[in-house]
């Protein structure tokens, strides 16, 4: 099954300009469809961004467009997803059915592809977390960059937001470049939040040998890492596995 992004107005009614209002049998509240698990949404400069957790292969960041079909369950990332859940190259005729209901289709459409993706492999992760465009002043190098996380591994990355918008060009191979955020904590520099969270988990009374939760890439539990900002646009890192909210301060 796939997920959709819905649109209603302030009175919980369906806007007249929703894309499927006039499509017979369609759910009129749907704004965009074909995402597996778009569990994190954020707005930036009038653009809606959805971080969607993948099945076995790709985690994705998507620019949500009116009426767009992001392909799931026939696409994952910029590849074709087969019925046995194996990934293959895209077909030359890259079109998929428009599924109006479980049994009714209405023609075909070219899928819309992500602007960022990363694999379920070391250096990537298991589940894309929160993301936001940083507007604060504490970290100039991140200003106007899209900062996002992987939940389980504790990776924090950024991408140039303008590059993300440019990557939404209809070419499935066009992706914005991901850059790793290094974390300085107590005099040491880390590639991910995972060792920081693991240390705090035990210091705060955690009883397990490893962090709780299942994570296939790390094999060692979940850091459960997310980002947020305050009213001034400054960045915070939230890690549920150790129950800590950390303020990101100016580099020293």
Regions found by a protein language model. Name each.
Residues 1-217, 222, 251:
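Beta-propeller domain segments
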Residues 225-252:
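Blade-level signature of beta-propeller repeat domains, shared across WD40, Kelch, NHL, RCC1
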